[in-house]
């Protein structure tokens, strides 16, 4: 079992006043059914979740459960229940604890996610402002433009209302904001889900637009799009399981640029390990003086980074700074019918779980160690290494960035990562079926805990290189320019 903290094996998550604005077309769930679901959720999380009390005391967490129970004490539409559940799960402050878009029932998924309610362009949030990255054919909408308001609601207000529903570890709000970017990398976008549920619109929207180039203001009317249309805008063919996901290019001077936009390759039939093997052979043949690994936009998935680190080290690399912990040895029989997973070994850790105290067990991986080392592998790359990072990096990519920086294997360039130095939860999952409402909540099973006190933050790059609206307007990649400048000094 790998140490990466993938959101699922299958693929890939206010105010009550906002919730009541939802339409009545959604399925209704009676209070009696919701009370059963919240009791199940409470028992499962209090028994199995390793990070439940990382950022909340037991008393605080009990209060969160009580507030969810109160919200569900009256019947709700499934959309209202989904919002209440998502708001509750966000309070756990775990980047892998959410009502996973891809693990909902078909009926719930169709009802909640498939409507014609999505903005038709791509954008990212920069300094609290919605900045267009690609107009996607919307007339009079250009890269770098700011959407200052939608149907009269300011961009700042939209961001403020959506953030409480987004997932991230601890107080790493940069990750929460990054979750709300729409840049063509996700099959279902977090922004699309919560904006549609909280701010329902007719099939067109009025966009208040401000030009980054000259400050001119204008109003643009744009039609909303469906989930199918959103997926057609994606950067890669998501249905081709054989497509290469990584790419290798060489800049002048044979500087290698390894772009890795996604490590969620669980169902991929592409030989990604073979690609990395061949990439390092090419670097060796070309005697590349530097390697730039571009992880921007990559949340994580498999431990693909271990295959890269294996070529950067001359001896096996120990990962002793963090300890893996679980809350149980064997799952209670009464919970098993509600716990789906891809690997039933997660139901019984056996002798691999060694009691630490009344709350935790240490989970052993290899030779009595909590984490197996990364084994050195040739050919070793001896040149300069630069890794481009941003707030999306919150799971396996966060761990990779942390290992690279902590072991001085390379220079991190870009923006602070997601994840959290206080540890994250994942590695193995149950998909908790709340059968009465037809909703699901992801339940991570393995928590990593640092051996020494750490800040409540992601990894801060060695060199900060932030994207700006002007960069987007002009097509400039300032982070890559910075990385190439560092590489040129190799």
Give the positions of each predicted feature.
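Extended, charge-rich low-complexity interaction segments
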Residues: 265, 351-364, 443-458
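A hydrophobic, small-residue-rich beta->alpha segment in the mid-to-C-terminal subdomain
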Residues: 458-470
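N-terminal export signals
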Residues: 4-6, 11-27
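Low-complexity, serine/threonine/proline-enriched polar segments
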Residues: 330-359
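Alpha-helix-centered segments that form part of catalytic cores
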Residues: 188-190, 198-200, 351-383
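Short, surface-exposed connector motifs at secondary-structure boundaries
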Residues: 288-292, 380-386
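Flexible, low-complexity junctional segments that flank or bridge functional domains
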Residues: 25-327, 332-341, 421-434, 440, ...
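Extended C-terminal subregions enriched in glycine
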Residues: 384-406, 411-422
